[in-house]
Amino acid sequence: MITDPIADFCSAIQNAAYAKKKEIKVPYSFLKERIAQVMLHEGYLEKIEKIEVRKNIFELKVVLKEPALITKIKRISKPGLRQYVGYKEIPNILRGLGICILSTSRGIMAGHRAKRMKLGGELLLAIY
């Protein structure tokens, strides 16, 4: 049983980047798809696709950029210890070279976008 599907998703992407794999398939969830869309928008991924394996059973196919831009994905807010930040406390990852992903009242978004919109929320991931 997977207790933290988001951490499992992050590990799968990070392991694929280390192994220089082009694509991975993970069990689908709405939150994983939204996180992948933010990573796609920020240029870390090439393509994402929702695939139906069987009736009402889906997988998320994630295609990484060719030279893997991801060196580390760190899960910040965990099921046992949630981390919430206001827009003034959103961290600057590696002086702007990385991004953080937040879950806000307006959806899942990158930290710099949330800061610009003056939105705080749950700090999900740091990618660099």
From Swiss-Prot:
GO CC terms, sorted: ribonucleoprotein complex; ribosome
GO annotation (BP), single: translation
InterPro entries in UniProt: Ribosomal_uS8 (IPR000630), Ribosomal_uS8_CS (IPR047863), Ribosomal_uS8_sf (IPR035987)
Keyword Transport belongs to the record: no
GO molecular function, one term: rRNA binding
Top-level taxon: Bacteria
Record note on quaternary structure: Part of the 30S ribosomal subunit. Contacts proteins S5 and S12.
Role description: One of the primary rRNA binding proteins, it binds directly to 16S rRNA central domain where it helps coordinate assembly of the platform of the 30S subunit.
Protein name: Small ribosomal subunit protein uS8
Organism expressing this protein natively: Methylacidiphilum infernorum (isolate V4) (Methylokorus infernorum (strain V4))
Gene from which this protein is expressed: rpsH
